[in-house]
Amino acid sequence: RCSYGIGGNIAKNSAPYMTAYYNNNTHVGGIQGTISNRPNPDLRWEKTTTANIGVDFSMFRNRLNGSIEYYNKSGVDLLANTNGVPTEGFGFSTYTMNNGKMRNRGFELTLSGDVIMGKDWNWNVGGVLGYNKNKVTYVNVKAPAIFLQFDYPAAYPRVGVPYNAIYGYLWAGLDSKGQPQVYDSEGNIHVSSSPQKVEDAVYLGTSVPVYSGAINTNLRYKNWELAAQLLFEGGHKMRNTNIAYPGLGVTSKDVSKRWCQPGDEAYTDVPRYVPSESKDYNSYSSDLYSKASIHVLDADNWRLKNLSVTYHVPASVCQKFYVKNARIMLGMENVFTLAKSRDVKWMLGGYSKPNYLCNVNLNF
């Protein structure tokens, strides 16, 4: 099977005409107007062209079923920020226009198979896997300041990288005094001040999983049933918010690994503790350290989402109590999380306690 189509989307926060709101001026009296959106006479529909091809299959007398589909989505005239023209007089440094192009390519795979089919034993395993590669192919905008590139990456996308990008400084280690250092785009090391050029914020990964999926299994023996669901995702990054740095207000046991004496910079990336009263205090250190590339972590993770055991009460027992059928289920949700680092596990809520369930179902 294959398909090809074009979809459209209209802007909800932009219009061909100037929009403004009016309110009372409490200082000089009268009514005052404020422009909320500049006119956009060239506003057009966002258009997404989608082409896909897929195959559905069944094998081994329907014991193995599945499908695989490849897709290619190309978006044009996408709404994005563009740099404003100061002489227009509207007061906007950027405004929304049909100013972007983006591409998504990937595939989706679905499988379901009966591993065991017997009188007493039945075992079914199924799963789904999705892969998507996203890239901005055109946009005519640049962040006016580097902090906007960090704080609002989706408002200032870059060509050639994913839309949901994470940016940061390239880490240069600690200096001989235990202070954090980063590189700028020209390879210069900064320790006493933050790099200022937008190009100094380098692309470090996407915050959206490149691949994700689930594995479901159901094992049944006579009246007993065991079921589980495992979720996984990867290929993306997360910015660590659990940083061992006193100035960031986070308490972490990694602070015990901090720089204490000259030479420690060869063994640790945790800066020294410098109180604000010290002559060595640097107000830029927390910004350099928190936005450094060492704090953008691989976010690959596996989560056992559900685990349950169900007992189906025999029909002979149900009849004695005038019940058509009954079952008793004991289960757990959010059983455990596996991640590449304990910081990622913490940010994903992986240390939360599981939820326990007990369910009795009676059908009269």
Where in the sequence are the language-model features?
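Glycine-rich, aromatic-lined ligand/substrate-binding cores of catalytic
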Residues: 204-241
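A short local loop/turn or secondary-structure capping micro-motif enriched for an aromatic residue
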Residues: 75-76, 190-192, 235-237, 346-348
